[in-house]
């Protein structure tokens, strides 16, 4: 279903036109098509509502959700190595000589081309939420690389996409460290029982605390010894729990049952109406959380 699990947050660095009607046509030019026999990977747009709609965008209250699909061919290294060694051995026996490195490299390409049509495919989907009201773009993934790949596809589709990772005026890890040291987070937030602390020294250690009182003397001693908090589990207004990371990303989002059940009165058979209602609910909550978080972390860095 729609509920995002992670958030990589980006700021639009200047205003651009993001009208859904126009975007629908632009995304259609980069719609997903499966890998051909010689493609290692393909990426493109699919309807965020899956088989329930052909639209590549879903819009509500100035919020747009889109979905990218990626197909990757799986060719394990041992399979390539085995096929290549067999081909090299066969040719060396036929020609009664050792093959040069350039010849072996050329053979590797041949082997890849011969194996590709028979390779299995791995599919993945990444949802992206565009907040045109606040000038933010959120990608539902846990890695910056995956987020950047999805943003690159959108940039190619639109022709231009001036975005930068959302960054704070003060280093996030120092703010998180102060929250743990004082035992109190910013207004609206509550410390949970999980954190990661890292030494500022290059060869320093990493401490991962789970199901632990973060106000305990043990954690305080690590901070006094020079470690900083790089990940911190937080609760926001008893509505959403998440792990705040020092790169500005939010991981392992967990919406409270009361929130998720808010649209239970909608007939489950009416997928489109439920999708729309959940999208409005989720984006409204997350937009408020992000704004609250920016304020709590000391404000955004000047652009």
UniProtKB/Swiss-Prot annotation:
Its main location: cytoplasm. GO terms for molecular function: double-stranded DNA binding. One of its GO terms (biological process) is DNA recombination. It is found in: Cytoplasm, Nucleoid. The keyword Cytoplasm applies. GO terms for cellular component: bacterial nucleoid; cytoplasm. Pfam families: RdgC. InterPro entries: RdgC. Keywords: Cytoplasm, DNA recombination. HAMAP family: RdgC. May be involved in recombination. Belongs to the RdgC family. This is Recombination-associated protein RdgC. The gene is rdgC.
